[in-house]
Structures are given as C-alpha cells and as structure tokens.
C-alpha cells in the first residue's frame, strides 16, 4: 500500500507516476474523501476543544456553588455529536483504505518507461543456445516417453494439470532439491516449510487481495466447524513474507533471507488459449522461492544480489538465459522494480520467463505493518523482496529441451547427477 501522506502532499505527481505504469488513479474520489476527512476531523477537534472548555467551566461553577445543569447538558450533547463524528471519520478512513488497497506501487526512477512487454529492456545474456544437428522436439514430445503424463493429469483434475512418473518425477525432485541446497548452502537463505493454505488477511499483506481474487483457488473446511474461506497459495512468497507481519524487528535481525520449495496454485484467469500445450502454464506447479526482508537503504543492492542467486542456478545447470528489466507497464502490482530471467526454449526458438525478482520497497510492509528499529531506535517500515529461484516445472522444460538427444534420451546436467544417483542420461525404456 502506498503511503497516504504521499498522495496528500502531491496527488497529481503520484497520479502521473501511476499513469506511467498504466494505472488511472481516481483523483476526484481521493480528493473528495480527503476533503470530507479534513472537515470531519476539524469539526471533531473543535467539539473536543469546546467540551474541554465547558468541563473547566463546570469545575469553576461548582466551586462557586452555581447551577451547572445547562452546561452539563451541553457537554452531554457534544459527547453524542463526537461519537457520531468519530463513527463518520472511521467510515471515511475505511473508504480511503479500500481505495488505496487497489492502487499499485510506484515505479522506481530507474524503471524504463513502456506500456507493455515490448518496452522491457534486456540487461545481459549468458550462454549460447545449442545448435542441434537433428530436428528439435518440444518438451512434451521429449518428456512423454520418459514419464510426462498429461492424459492422467487431465483425467484426475482437468486441463492444466500434469502427472509426472518415474524418471521425470525424479528429475523434477532433483531440480527442486538442487535449488534449495544452492540457496541455503551458498547464498545464506534459511529453508522454510510453509502452510499451503492461508487466511485472506495474509493475501492482503502481500497484495494478492483484493485485486486478484480471481487468480486464486479458494478452499473451505468440511465438517461442523465454522466455515471460513481460505486460499491456496499462488507462491510461497505469500507465507514467507508474512512471517514478519505485525512485528517490530531489531536492526541486527536484518537481513532476513528465507527460501521454500512449495506447490503453487493459480487459476490462470484471463489466460484462456495461452500455452495450452505442455508445462509452461499450469494450475499447479512447484517453485523454489527466495524472500528477503531488509533495511530500506540496502534493498536495491539486495535486489541485484537476488537476481544473481537465480542466475547461479541457471549457470550451474548450463542453461542459456537473459535478464531483462520490466518496464513501467509490465510490472506486477506490488513491485517498484522487477527483473525477469528468461531461459532459452529451443522448440519455441525464444526465451521464456523462468524467474521474476522484485523489490516492493515498503509497499507490502505497510500492508503487513512489518517494521524494524532504525539507527535512532524508531520503528520504520522494512523493505521486502521476492524472487523465483526457480520455477521448477519451467526449469524441467528447459532441461528436457536443451539437453535432448537424437535417440530420445536426455543428458542429465552435471550439477543434478549427485541427486540422481550418478545417472548421466534419462533413457527411453525399450519396447
């Protein structure tokens, strides 16, 4: 959530920056609510001052033995008015909060201007795409003989669900384990196992609600317990980041670096007809997530570090990729700045997103009330960052396609072989 003081000080300036990312702020609605708030607050303060004055007058009158009934009646009337005014002020504050909860973060000054993904800027590339001397297959054709089972996944759960069997299941597990080990052993993250079901207020904290409710899977408890709507996580960023909600951390507790391997559940609303073949866009997929909770002055250095951590995974797997900076019109709701890592997908002859690393600055922290004690000992909002390290299913896609062989086998990247008992190739079973 944006700091409301920013809007109060420079409403037109904030509206301009939001317009840069394709969001139209309802300036008139905010200005009207603010005017109503100021008027109500001023009236409340005037009544408070009048009541205080009358209370002193009552004391003086009693000291003189004078009749105070009329003045006390006026004080009582003011009290009733103040209660009504306070209720009105609470309602205005609630409406202001609801308005702000739908407003995205402000883009950092270094973010390139652009309306959509065509405005994204490439930062660097690593690796050279392999030149094949045979006809390249996509991951569906490579993976199906090795245990990729879309038919059973669809039979069990419908479209965009997949079952992995045998060698493919082992490779998928090896990828996740390799990522977690790298982040915990080399990058200083603490591994966390998180709940996959969270309460609505947790999603408000990280910005999925209220704006993106249609992208989530909702669940309800069975039995006789009071029914409360909860949600399946769309990323473990949600649960990891909210570990510091309603907290005041000591400065020496920062940075906090957390990582988790979890399934992610997304309804993919609005994605009809996109990436219908294969593993690229699924309702359920695994991801290894990185989250950092840091002091504000270090957050952009932390963002660069986090991107480097995601790059390390791709480099160890020998997968060609590129890093791009998302433009103002292509960033996610909570982000102030985002880098995407895109891996080379040979069958599509293009790069596809495999990681997104974002600095949300204080946007999520304000919604969660996550603070730390700064150098002056005063509570200040932390900055929160999140990044994929990596999307496991899409990494599986990249391995299958980049390491495929003419005979249908897949060479196992050297970094993964210790997780697969030293196996160097996934072979298609005879017959």
Swiss-Prot record:
Catalyzes the attachment of serine to tRNA(Ser). Is also able to aminoacylate tRNA(Sec) with serine, to form the misacylated tRNA L-seryl-tRNA(Sec), which will be further converted into selenocysteinyl-tRNA(Sec). Its EC number is 6.1.1.11. This is Serine--tRNA ligase. Signal peptide: none annotated. Pathway: Aminoacyl-tRNA biosynthesis; selenocysteinyl-tRNA(Sec) biosynthesis; L-seryl-tRNA(Sec) from L-serine and tRNA(Sec): step 1/1. It catalyses: tRNA(Ser) + L-serine + ATP = L-seryl-tRNA(Ser) + AMP + diphosphate + H(+); tRNA(Sec) + L-serine + ATP = L-seryl-tRNA(Sec) + AMP + diphosphate + H(+). Its main location: cytoplasm. ATP binds at residues 266-268, 353-356. Keywords: Aminoacyl-tRNA synthetase, ATP-binding, Cytoplasm, Ligase, Nucleotide-binding, Protein biosynthesis. L-serine binds at residues 235-237, 289, 388.
């Amino acid at each position: 959530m944006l700091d409301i003081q920013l809007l109060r000080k420079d409403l037109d300036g904030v509206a301009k920056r939001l317009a840069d990312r394709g969001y139209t702020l309802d300036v008139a609605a905010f200005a009207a609510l603010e005017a109503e708030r100021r008027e109500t607050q001023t009236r409340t303060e005037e009544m408070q001052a009048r009541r205080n004055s009358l209370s002193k007058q009552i004391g003086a009158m009693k000291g003189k033995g004078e009749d105070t009934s009329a003045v006390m009646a006026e004080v009582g009337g003011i009290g009733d008015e103040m209660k009504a005014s306070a209720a009105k002020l609470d309602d205005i504050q609630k409406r202001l909060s609801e308005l702000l909860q739908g407003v995205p973060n402000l883009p950092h000054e270094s973010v390139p201007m652009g309306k959509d993904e065509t405005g994204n800027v490439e930062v660097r590339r690593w690796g050279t795409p392999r030149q094949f001397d045979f006809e390249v297959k996509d991951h569906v054709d490579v993976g199906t003989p090795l245990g990729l089972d879309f038919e059973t996944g669809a039979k069990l759960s419908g479209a965009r669900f997949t079952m992995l069997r045998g060698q493919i299941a082992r490779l998928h597990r090896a990828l996740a384990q390799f990522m977690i080990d790298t982040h915990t052993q080399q990058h200083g993250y603490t591994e966390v196992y998180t709940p996959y079901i969270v309460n609505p207020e947790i999603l408000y904290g990280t910005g999925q609600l209220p704006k993106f409710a249609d992208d989530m899977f909702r669940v309800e408890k069975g039995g006789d317990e009071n029914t409360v709507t909860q949600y399946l996580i769309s990323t473990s960023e949600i649960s990891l980041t909210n570990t510091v909600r309603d907290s005041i951390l000591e400065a020496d507790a920062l940075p906090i670096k957390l990582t988790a391997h979890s399934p992610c559940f997304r309804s993919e609303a609005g994605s009809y007809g996109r990436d219908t073949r294969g593993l690229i866009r699924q309702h359920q997929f695994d991801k290894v997530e990185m989250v950092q909770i840091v002091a504000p002055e270090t957050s952009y250095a932390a963002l660069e570090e986090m991107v480097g951590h995601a790059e390390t995974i791709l480099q160890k797997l020998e997968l060609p990729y590129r890093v791009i900076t998302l433009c103002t019109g292509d960033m996610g709701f909570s982000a102030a700045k985002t880098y995407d890592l895109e891996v080379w997908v040979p069958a599509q002859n293009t790069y596809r997103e495999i990681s997104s690393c974002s600095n949300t600055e204080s946007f999520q922290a304000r919604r969660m009330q996550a603070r730390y004690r700064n150098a002056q000992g005063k509570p200040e909002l932390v900055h929160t960052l999140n990044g994929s390290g990596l999307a496991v299913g899409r990494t599986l896609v990249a391995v299958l396609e980049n390491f495929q062989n003419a005979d249908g086998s897949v060479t196992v990247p050297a970094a993964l072989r210790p997780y697969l008992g030293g196996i160097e190739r996934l072979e298609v079973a005879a017959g």
